[in-house]
Amino acid sequence: MMHKSNLIEDNKRGENQSFLYFLHEEKKFDVKALDDLCHYIIELDTISLEQLRDIHYIENQILRHLVYHFDDNDLSKISNLPFEYWEYIEPFERLVASLYEGEVKEE
């Protein structure tokens, strides 16, 4: 995978076909974009405090979109949310938790 762009920054801004772009702008759950973000984070040599804050923001936005999707009073619905969506979200959450703990990340 080429790292032409900063996927953390792209997701934070919801730009460049990032996972949060698809989730927020197109109301789509893009499995590949989420996988790309995870691999991008795993491949980083170091993570700055600013990047960690951005990843925390991304994680919160993902959870908010899921809450909105399941809220009967909210019109925002993810058009293609997989039935087993948690199987895709959980690896990202484990990765983020490992960053908080300062653990070595593995694929």
Specify the residue positions occupied by each region the protein language model found.
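Short, solvent-exposed segments of well-ordered alpha helices
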Residues: 25-35, 49, 53, 76-79, ...
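Residue-level detector of well-ordered alpha-helical segments, enriched
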Residues: 3, 33, 51-54, 58, ...
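Short secondary-structure junctions and interdomain/linker hinges
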Residues: 14, 18, 44, 48, ...
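Functionally constrained cores in energy, signaling, and assembly domains
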Residues: 4-5, 11-12, 44, 69, ...
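Amphipathic alpha-helical binding modules
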Residues: 61-107
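Short terminal alpha-helical segments
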Residues: 1-38
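Short hydrophobic interaction/assembly module
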Residues: 45-70
